[in-house]
Each structure stands twice: as structure tokens, then as C-alpha cells.
Amino acid sequence: MFASSVRVAGGQDQSWMFGPFEKPAPVNPVIAPRSTSTFRSPMNDSTVLWEEYATFNPGAVVRGGKVYLLYRAEDASGDKEIGHHTSRLGLAESSDGLHFTRRQTPVLYPDRDRQASYEWPGGVEDPRIVESDDGTYILTYTQWNRDVPRLAVATSRDLVSWQKHGPAFAKADSGRYMRLETKSGAIVCRVNGNRLVAARINGKYWMYFNVPEILVATSDNLVDWTPLADAESRLVKVLTPRPGYFDSWLVEAGAPAILTESGIVLFYNAGNSGRYGQEGLPARMYTGGQALFDARNPIKLLARSTTPFIRPTEEYEKTGQYKEGTTFVEGLVPFDGRWFLYYGMADSRVGVAVWDPHGSAVKSPR
């Protein structure tokens, strides 16, 4: 498909899966740190180089014939430990899905607003984007105050101006989940042209979330969410690590989940254990997996990949903040007849992998 590309190891090992994806080597990474972007932080009234240290973990959406990425950017404040910098969300656009132009300032960031105590000093992290039926963009992201990570929701009509709605589970069960560590919200969507539109199943919207096990939540309005719990108030785990496999250490919800003819395909990030993981795969390496859930019962697991469909193979995926290597999947869009997967490289850069489904045996999204 590309003059110079890398076929992703693992690929597609079951017919319901998306892939195989190829990494177009000449363009990767598509976004890297930049030391010329300045921003006046409203939190301490200082000018910061807001994307100087790292740019990674993007959400993606197609709007007006272009691909837009919301990506996590870190400044160089704090020490050199992961999670010890301040994160803000930048916006980039592309007419081909491969070459991006960035805005000079972030579009979502810690501000002197009602969310400040949840978002400062760690910032806003790891965006995922879907649309509602009326075209409103629904953003899930992590609020990080360096105490408790909280999954939060924001909405926008134009991807630039965002309304923060606060922690996703603030109203659930009289606030009992406000101290629960939550992150990584992947909302179930249907494909409508180049749009991924949040889908109702049994009258509710559904979202897979969290790490090291994947949980599930429902909503009536895409803003206020309630985690699914059993009769004893234990949160329902729908995907857990597997000894002996690439996902033996942890599993974490990835890009938005997609309704297909086969069921709901959930893309997830997976960590390998050094003691009881997959042989030949480095300890603590992050790869990508896919899981299939019943379209009428989103907590019923039908199948899951036995090997990673994407994994670190290139030097730029194994050098940076996370030296064990990551291909952290968060953004996926249908565009120009293909599927573009956007992912974080070693917590430092943004990469892309592309799948052309023409002629593939995989069942089509619906």
C-alpha cells in the first residue's frame, strides 16, 4: 500500500478482527515534541513550552474531509518521571491522514475553573473522541491532579472550544466513585460514513474503561455515566489479564469500540508480565489487542486476539519516556476508504498505522 511500510507483527488472527495494519515508515512519527510552541498558563500566569517534552496518545475524528487529532502534550516541568509533568491537549489536522498541521496553543488544559482541583498540576491526559447523533463531539479524558486519576467528559461543536463536564462518574450512586481511580473511556460507536457515532444498545450508551482490568459503564446522555456493578456492588470486569499471553500484566481500554456485523470490537492496550507473560515479548511492553463482545449484551465476551495486532517494532516506538516500548492505541477513524489507527509511541510521539479492508474477509462495520 505504501512505497515503504512495515507490516504489523501479529496482524489479524481471527476473521472478526480489524487489520492487518501497516505502519507507513516515511511519515512516522506523525507528531513529535516541539520546542517552539508557547502558551500562557492561566494556573500560574507563566509562559510554558507546552509540547516540548512529549506528544503522544491521540484521539481522532474526521470533520469536513480532514482527520483531526487531539493529542496529549507534556511540558518539561517537574522531574523526569512519567506522570510528573503537566499535560495539555493539542489539536492537529490533516487532509491525507498522514501529514499534520498543528495549532500553536492547546485546546484543552488546566484552567481556573471548577475542574482545577482535579486537573492541576498533572493536567489533562489521553483523549478519546466520538460524536453524538447531532454532531456534538464527546471527549473522554483523564483528569490528573497527582492524587487520584479521574475519567472525565468534555463536549464541543468545533473541536476548539470545549465545555468541561467534570468526572464521568460524579453523579453515580451518590458520588461513591469519586475516589475511585478511573481512566481510558472507550465509548461504543456505530460507523456512519467517516463518522463514529455513539450507539445506543438496549436503550443505553455503553463505555468500556479502566486499567488493569476493563470495566463497563452506561449513560443516558453521554456525559453522566454509571459503572455496571453486580448484586453485591462489585464492579463488573469484562476483560482481565491472561497468564501466558501478551496481555498477562494488564489490559486497558483503547480506541472507541465499534459495532460490526460480528459484534462489538473493542481495541485495548495490553501489558506483558515479565514472570508469567508471553515468551519472547519483553516485560512491561505495551502492545495492542482486540476483543469481541455481543452486540446485544456488551458485557458478554465472545472472543479475543491471541497475539498482538500491533506492537513496538521500530526504534522510535522503543525510545523515549517508556523505554520498554509502547504502541498505545487511542484514535481510530474510517477515512478515504481505509482505517487509520493513531497511537502513542513510548509515551513520547504519535504514530499511525493503516488498514485497507478492500478484499479482506473481515466482516464490515455496520
Residue ranges and their predicted role:
Residues 317-319, 327-330:
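Short glycine-rich, acidic/polar surface loops and turns
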Residues 2-122, 130-249, 258-322, 336-366:
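Beta-rich carbohydrate-recognition and catalytic domains
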